[in-house]
Amino acid sequence: MEWCCALSGLLPEEIQKVCAFAERFRGVQVFRWIAAGCTDFHAMSDLSSETRARLARACVISDTRVYTTLRDVDGTLKLGIELKDKRRVEAVLLVDQVSRKTACLSCQVGCPMACAFCQTGQLGFARNLSASEIVEQFLHLERCVGTLDNVVFMGMGEPMLNLDAVCRAIEILSHPQGRDLSEKRITISTSGHCRGIYSLADRALQVRLAVSLTTANAPLRARLMPRAAHDSLAKLKSAIRYFNEKSGKRVTLELALMRGVNTSERHAQEVIDFAHGLNVHVNLIPWNPVASIHFETPREVEVAHFEALLMRARIPVTRRYQRGNGIGGACGQLGKTAGV
């Protein structure tokens, strides 16, 4: 057996093959240990000592490491994770009011989308993450806090530009012989990559979709989200409708609200018009401050008025409360400790 890639990115039958086990059930055993957070072959007590030693010589379970851990007073946890090539990403644990624990995972080192209001978008893009590097973020978080309830791909990067690896990671995390996380508890967030939305819909996964709309004003969206705006709002609406119809699931529209930028009555009406005919729910996200970006968090009255306008139009809407601000772990802040 020759040295192989990190086993955290493999399915049971692939572990069986690369490890050249004689017994067919050994791949499942190793897969279960990895899903349970094991990082040492010698701790896999249902394997023979000879097999454990052979695995330790030829394979690695994980090739990432946590280099920093930050905790906020609101319960948010941010991990800085170093990859094999010394590049770095961040993963975040979010805890809501009823103590549900959600892993916010990254899918790229940096991000090519260059959204004007996002810290990660200012870093530029280095490379995609592998499935193992995505899975390991989840495993690192579970080692810190125990069982996680949900996963959101809302960390660093555009998931639709690394969809194969993202879906591969989902397959591993949801595998019934491993972690067995329900696909229904997983959300993929995109800046509005239409081709990716169609592709995700056609894969027939049970995951949820969130779209970072930010504004339904085309010129403003082109300024705030220059790469995402390459697909017109009309094309984006068609892609969302396709996902609605193909999956039968409601789509979340995310609006990062910035003071005096996208919070007027006209902007609200444009969102209402965009949402018409779609099965969507709107999330309002007051912009989280980033030192190098010169926007401002909206006043409470701006957010409340915007929310009221959507409610009056019978658009389902929720205001997301800020979490992780104290450690740079909130929406739009990731990358401060990572670099590219």
Curated annotation (Swiss-Prot):
Residues 97-325 form the Radical SAM core domain. It catalyses: adenosine(2503) in 23S rRNA + 2 reduced [2Fe-2S]-[ferredoxin] + 2 S-adenosyl-L-methionine = 2-methyladenosine(2503) in 23S rRNA + 5'-deoxyadenosine + L-methionine + 2 oxidized [2Fe-2S]-[ferredoxin] + S-adenosyl-L-homocysteine; adenosine(37) in tRNA + 2 reduced [2Fe-2S]-[ferredoxin] + 2 S-adenosyl-L-methionine = 2-methyladenosine(37) in tRNA + 5'-deoxyadenosine + L-methionine + 2 oxidized [2Fe-2S]-[ferredoxin] + S-adenosyl-L-homocysteine. The keyword rRNA processing applies. It is an enzyme of class 2 (transferase). S-adenosyl-L-methionine binds at G157, E158, S189, S212, L213, T214, N288. Keywords: 4Fe-4S, Cytoplasm, Disulfide bond, Iron, Iron-sulfur, Metal-binding, Methyltransferase, rRNA processing, S-adenosyl-L-methionine, Transferase, tRNA processing. The keyword Protease does not apply. [4Fe-4S] cluster binds at C111, C115, C118. PROSITE patterns: RADICAL_SAM (PS51918). Pfam families: Radical_SAM, RlmN_N. GO terms for molecular function: 4 iron, 4 sulfur cluster binding; metal ion binding; rRNA (adenine(2503)-C2-)-methyltransferase activity; rRNA binding; tRNA (adenine(37)-C2)-methyltransferase activity; tRNA binding. One of its GO terms (biological process) is rRNA base methylation. Its main location: cytoplasm. Binds 1 [4Fe-4S] cluster. The cluster is coordinated with 3 cysteines and an exchangeable S-adenosyl-L-methionine. Its EC number is 2.1.1.192. The active site is at E90 (proton acceptor), C331 (s-methylcysteine intermediate). Disulfide bonds join C104-C331. Its cofactor is [4Fe-4S] cluster. It is found in: Cytoplasm. GO terms for cellular component: cytoplasm. Reaction proceeds by a ping-pong mechanism involving intermediate methylation of a conserved cysteine residue. Specifically methylates position 2 of adenine 2503 in 23S rRNA and position 2 of adenine 37 in tRNAs. Belongs to the radical SAM superfamily. RlmN family. This is Probable dual-specificity RNA methyltransferase RlmN. It comes from Treponema pallidum (strain Nichols). The gene is rlmN.
